């Protein structure tokens, strides 16, 4: 079991690092397929050994950060990603898990459109706001650009309040036309329709977006309170009736064999479509069964995305470059002769670690096979031995850090080489980049290039130095005009007000993720109280394991860290928790902790208003009646939900009874 525990800890380290590089830095060091593989491994371990699953596990994260070109807006409910399946075995495991949980099941199969996920909000039947997915929690407001898409109705037939989600995409014909125009104008063409769609929707001038001829397929309703659907297929049919564009190639199947037949059909037919797809989405069709299965923090348990097999090409490995991460891990990266893979030109691919290089016998000068698992980030699959040059040599990682010259070490149980010098320049810079990221101190405008300049000009050596920067420090930097400097200084000043959990996460304490930072901040409230905490005390807290407890205490006992905190405090950086404590949330005694379903037409308020009020009282409002539903509030013309409530013996209230409870009568 000790070996399993060490592997879980290693997977946590790797996945957190890769997620940070990809979603926060926008500078991934590994291919998406490697991340998916490691995540898949961790999921399987956690399923087999539930005692090793923690609330800050990478399997509950949703990685990723919204761009800054448009206003950032929080989603009413998170836009979760889907779990991935890459082969028949993965799909059969998913099916078995579903049937073990809810018994007999019917699936809805839908094409996975290769575009940009969007969320559209309607109030009284009018389109009022459109957001990108962003990091799943916060998206970009691209309403004006979405209004230019003719497939999105600006007003629907009924005065409903809801949010509908889907995929904006560029049809292949529009893509070809756009790239022809760009080439004629001497501009760089887009690599693929997906990039073109994303770039078009991020145009600040909506007139330019309008010229791009985008379209959209809608695939889910976020809040079915005002809908009558009891299945995914019925929900899509209702969207059709309201005037929305849904994908008509969907198919309802009775079992996993039907799913496999659907995948086989579209694997061969995908080229005949007028738009790109990168897989198939499989969902449990019955909405009450979806409700029963629920969600992880990362994805719904009742759906999965099958990814089409990756395209493979051959190119030459020109060199191996090394990079050092925030935790000191040294990662080798293949420098490749540029080659087109799945629509984009690839010139770099991660080699992960020395063990993988030796296992695959990859050498500089080799002809290598490259693929994009998931059609996103490239990886080196293998060398082609019969093309190997006679003078090739086995590659060996250096013995000393390429940044600071300190001796590299391999910690027992790990495959990575690490630089353990706390003053290593590369690590310090990566730590600074982490500190200013959105989930940490969220200092908008302080990007990677500026941090490099500040460090190289000896203007910052640690995170506290950021708060001592002045206008005269910033103005001489490259591409830093007066307005940009003023905005950056305002962002730095604003970040001082961040709640304690953001500071804790930003400090980069080993093993301390976003969730655990929140737990510690809420429990201890101030940095002063955290300084007094003991390892044995931390271990008693749910979600804080032995390794994290030891890491936190060791970090906070360090005299250099205490000096750093004092330096931050001297610049009035907030050291207190500003959120609402879980224990302080009080709701209406008749509703708090209850699972409630609204159905039918209410006279005194809309169902949306009733839903919001109930949530404020601590109730959980769901769309489907299940055996776990506590109360069904039925208005006029209540349909199948009322019938199901009667079948289950669920408590049923009229609107009048609900209002009496509201008023305490």
UniProtKB/Swiss-Prot annotation:
> One of this protein's GO BP terms?
DNA replication
| Task of the protein | DNA ligase that catalyzes the formation of phosphodiester linkages between 5'-phosphoryl and 3'-hydroxyl groups in double-stranded DNA using NAD as a coenzyme and as the energy source for the reaction. It is essential for DNA replication and repair of damaged DNA.
- EC top class, in one word? ligase
Instruction: Name the source's superkingdom.
Output: Bacteria
Q: Identify the HAMAP family for this entry.
A: DNA_ligase_A
User: What are the BRCT domain coordinates in residue numbering?
Assistant: 586-665
Q: What is its EC number?
A: 6.5.1.2
Q: Which InterPro entries match?
A: BRCT_dom, BRCT_dom_sf, DisA/LigA_HHH, DNA_ligase, DNA_ligase_AS, DNA_ligase_CS, DNAligase_adenylation, DNAligase_N
- Sites where the protein binds NAD(+): 32-36, 81-82, 110, 133, 167, 283, 307
Which cofactor is recorded for it?
Mg(2+); Mn(2+)
Please report the name of this protein according to its UniProt entry.
Answer: DNA ligase
Q: GO CC: one term? A: cytosol
Q: Which keywords label this protein?
A: DNA damage, DNA repair, DNA replication, Ligase, Magnesium, Manganese, Metal-binding, NAD, Zinc
Residues forming the catalytic site: 112 (n6-amp-lysine intermediate)
Q: Output the CDD domains linked to this UniProt entry.
A: BRCT_DNA_ligase_like (cd17748), LIGANc (cd00114)
A Pfam family recorded for this sequence:
DNA_ligase_OB
Tell me the protein family, please: Belongs to the NAD-dependent DNA ligase family. LigA subfamily.
Q: Where does Zn(2+) bind?
A: 401, 404, 419, 424
Gene name tied to this protein: ligA
Q: Which GO terms describe its molecular function?
A: DNA binding; DNA ligase (NAD+) activity; metal ion binding
So what does this thing catalyse?
A: NAD(+) + (deoxyribonucleotide)n-3'-hydroxyl + 5'-phospho-(deoxyribonucleotide)m = (deoxyribonucleotide)n+m + AMP + beta-nicotinamide D-nucleotide
Matching SMART domains: BRCT (SM00292), HhH1 (SM00278), LIGANc (SM00532)
What organism is this sequence from?
Answer: Staphylococcus epidermidis (strain ATCC 35984 / DSM 28319 / BCRC 17069 / CCUG 31568 / BM 3577 / RP62A)
